[in-house]
Each structure stands twice: as C-alpha cells, then as structure tokens.
C-alpha cells in the first residue's frame, strides 16, 4: 500500500522505516527541511537500536522517500498517518496545534478515499473533533486512531513483535484498510485490538500512566528500603514474579523521563480534572517523580558529608534511558542542574546523548567530555544516571587509579557491588541502606 507519515520525528521515522520493511511504499513528510536533507543523504537524525539496518534496506528497495512538500504525491496515498508532536501546555493539556496544522495541509491534497490515521498521542474525543472540524470545512474523510507503543531503545523489536496493535475506528472501511496495513504482523501472531475511537485514544494514556505509576511506586519502596535496610533488587523481584504484576518497570532509579511518560500522565491528569473527577493517584505520581532528582542529589550530599560546594562530580549517563539519544525530560539532566545549583563542578558523558545534551543544557561549571575515563579523572564521586551496558564494561581498576575519592553512587543499580568494592571503591545504590 501507499502510506504517508506526516512528521518524521521519533515515532514517524521509526514507523515509516518499519512499514516499508513490511512491504509498503512509504513517504515521510516533515516541515524540517534540514532533517529531510539529512535523511535524503541516508543520515539518520536519531539513534535507535537496529534502525539503521532497516533504514538502509528500505532505501535500497526504493520503498522509502522523504520530502518536506505537501504535493501531488499525496493524491496517491491510501492512508496518511499523523505522527507530529503533541507537547504539554502550561496547564498539562496536550497541545494539538501541530495535529490540526497537518490536517489542514493534507486535506487539500489527499483523495476522498484516503484514511487519516491519528498516531500522535491525543486526548479522548480528538478523532471525533477532527471529523467534525473537517466536515465544517466541507471534507468527509474517514479518521481512525492507531496509538503507538514503541519503547525508545527497543522500538524495532516492539514494531515487529508488538504486544498488541490497537485501532479505533467508526466504520468498516477504516478497519479494512488498517487490517490490510498490519496484515504482515497479524499473520505472524500479533493481536489486533479493534475498538471505538475514544477508547483507542484513552488506551495510550492509560498504558503510559500505569507504567509511570509502577516506576513511582518502586522508587518509593526504594526510599523505604534505604531506611529499614531491605534489599530493593530482591524486593522488586519478589513483587514482579507475581504474574498479576510482572517485573517490567520495577527497577528503582532516578525517576522516569523521555517524550511520553511525563507528558502523557500530565495530559491524562488534566483530562480527568476537566471531567470533574478527583485524580489523587496520578497527582501523587507526578509529584513523586518531580521530586525524585532532588531526592537523588540529597542522597549524594549525604554520602559526600553534606557539603557539595566545590566538589568535582562525574556523571555517567545523560539520556533518560539506555538505547536512545533522547534527553527530553531526562532525570540525569535534572540531577546535573540540581548538583550545579549546590555549587559543584560537573563533568558528564553519555555514549549516545552528548550532542542532544549540549543542545539542551549548558552551564559554565558543566563540561561534556567524549569518554567515561576522562569524566572520572580527579572526581570526588562518580554518579551513574543511565543504565548503559557500556558502564558495566568500563575498566574500573583503571578508573580507581584516576579518581580523587573512590566513591560510586549508582542510581541505576547496574554494577556488581563485590567487583567494584574489591577494587577499593565505596559503592552505593538506590534502595540500599546509607
């Protein structure tokens, strides 16, 4: 089928590349001409595990094109996916201005049988509102909801082997088109959840907010473990092996970040409030996660004898999680800001997130370096803020010989305590008694 993606950010680009792998002819359209220029030069503007392989393959098979022009090509598309951003307003509500901008532009070019698919995360009833908006302008396109559930760092596998594919439709024609698009995956065993438009939209918000709640819960359990001497790793395992709960998202750490969880839980909380419902759970999760970076810095201060002023801190990890170059709402960046506010000097490294971090945040007392070894040299403490496997494989014996004070504060609990302690490091984790 001929498919177009409007918006070539993380979701649009990954989905476009992988749709072409399924055999569809895909055009990715974006207003950012510099990004499109890069893509046409076969340069991926994001890092995502394994994506480069499928990107190259799609281009070689001539099933993937990039453009910044809304033109005649859209007349041949059978489905156009809206994958633009829906950032948070100050109120927490989702800003749909980019969605409506895309709708306005494509409605002038697509044919009457083309299906508009909203893949951007939008509040419940957005698709119905878009249908009414188009009718007011004299258009009668079918509109469907198809939320994405790709995890950054694991997006390729998530696309190929999804837990479920959710589609929200209000007629058989829309359902048939989406069934045809996803047939290569459903024939391979992927479960298709077909529902109405509003429910499909709400599934995405509910899923992300529930996962965020699991993270906030285990972080609060880690706080308790530190007070009473319990072991957070075994606690997480003992809870998570209950099949009703599951082990995913039960790793204690510095909090959740990224482009989805913080934004989506704020939006869902706003939706609930706007419907005159008291949202105690979500508000508690939002507050707990917002406070998490400062709690981590308080922990660091306690371990470094309270006064952080003038300390040289090495920070390993800038992205909000491993496997991506995304630093949006990253706990690591917030921790660095808190450390700088307390008068520290920070050197930071990340295997994939350096460039985005440098664009996002600069400070005269913050130095970004291109290796973990350089960052750790002469440090008063090493803070691990992202769970990159590269940090587990570092030459800790060599690092021990370079540091000023042999202290590791592992906010991701990824190192083996006996190994680094046998070298001579004082090693502290999240969820261990201070």
Curated annotation (Swiss-Prot):
Coiled-coil features, chain-numbered ranges: none
Positions of the catalytic residues: 260
Pfam families linked to this entry: UDPG_MGDP_dh (PF00984), UDPG_MGDP_dh_C (PF03720), UDPG_MGDP_dh_N (PF03721)
Catalytic EC class: oxidoreductase
EC annotation from Swiss-Prot or TrEMBL: 1.1.1.22
Keyword Thylakoid: no
GO molecular function: NAD binding; UDP-glucose 6-dehydrogenase activity
Binding-site residues, NAD(+): 2-19, 30, 35, 121, 152, 263, 328
Record-level GO BP terms: polysaccharide biosynthetic process; UDP-glucuronate biosynthetic process
Binding-site list for substrate: 148-152, 204, 208, 249-253, 257, 321
Disulfide topology: none
Reactions catalysed according to its record: UDP-alpha-D-glucose + 2 NAD(+) + H2O = UDP-alpha-D-glucuronate + 2 NADH + 3 H(+)
Keywords of this entry: NAD, Oxidoreductase
Pathway(s) served: Nucleotide-sugar biosynthesis; UDP-alpha-D-glucuronate biosynthesis; UDP-alpha-D-glucuronate from UDP-alpha-D-glucose: step 1/1
Family classification: Belongs to the UDP-glucose/GDP-mannose dehydrogenase family.
Protein name: UDP-glucose 6-dehydrogenase
Lineage: Bacteria, Pseudomonadati, Pseudomonadota, Alphaproteobacteria, Rickettsiales
């Amino acid at each position: 089928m001929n498919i177009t993606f409007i918006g070539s950010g993380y979701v649009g680009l990954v989905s476009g590349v992988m749709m072409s792998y399924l055999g569809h002819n895909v055009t990715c359209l974006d207003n950012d001409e510099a990004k499109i220029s890069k893509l046409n030069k076969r340069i991926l503007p994001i890092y995502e595990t394994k994506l480069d392989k499928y990107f190259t393959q799609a281009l070689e098979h001539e099933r993937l094109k990039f453009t910044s022009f809304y033109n005649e090509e859209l007349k041949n598309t059978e489905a156009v996916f809206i994958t633009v951003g829906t950032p948070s307003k100050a109120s927490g509500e989702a800003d749909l201005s980019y969605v409506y901008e895309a709708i306005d532009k494509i409605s002038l070019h697509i044919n009457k049988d083309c299906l508009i698919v909203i893949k951007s995360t939008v509040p419940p009833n957005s698709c119905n509102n878009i249908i009414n908006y188009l009718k007011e302008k004299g258009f009668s396109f079918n509109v469907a909801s198809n939320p994405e559930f790709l995890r950054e760092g694991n997006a390729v596998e998530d696309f190929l082997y999804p837990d479920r594919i959710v589609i929200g439709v209000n007629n058989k024609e829309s359902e048939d088109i989406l069934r045809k698009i996803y047939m290569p995956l459903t024939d391979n065993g992927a479960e298709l959840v077909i529902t109405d438009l509003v429910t499909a939209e709400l599934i995405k918000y509910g899923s992300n907010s529930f996962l965020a709640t699991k993270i906030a819960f285990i972080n609060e359990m880690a706080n308790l473990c530190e007070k009473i001497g319990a072991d957070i790793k075994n606690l997480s395992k003992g809870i998570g092996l209950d099949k009703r709960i599951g082990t995913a998202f039960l790793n204690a750490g510095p909090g959740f970040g990224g482009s989805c969880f913080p934004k989506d839980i704020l939006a869902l909380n706003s939706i609930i409030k706007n419907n005159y419902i008291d949202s105690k759970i979500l508000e508690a999760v939002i507050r707990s996660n917002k406070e998490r970076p400062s709690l981590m810095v308080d922990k660091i201060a306690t371990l470094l004898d309270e006064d952080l002023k003038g300390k040289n801190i090495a920070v390993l990890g800038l992205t909000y999680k491993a496997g991506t170059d995304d630093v949006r709402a990253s706990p690591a960046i917030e921790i660095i800001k808190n450390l700088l506010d307390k008068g520290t000097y920070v050197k930071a490294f990340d295997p994939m997130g350096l460039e985005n971090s440098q664009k996002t945040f600069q400070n005269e007392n913050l130095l970004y370096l291109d290796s973990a070894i350089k960052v750790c040299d002469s440090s008063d403490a090493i803070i691990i803020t992202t769970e990159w496997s590269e940090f587990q494989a570092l030459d800790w014996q060599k690092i021990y010989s370079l540091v000023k004070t042999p202290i590791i504060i592992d906010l991701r609990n990824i190192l083996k305590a006996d190994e680094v302690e046998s070298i001579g490091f004082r090693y502290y984790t999240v969820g261990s008694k201070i």
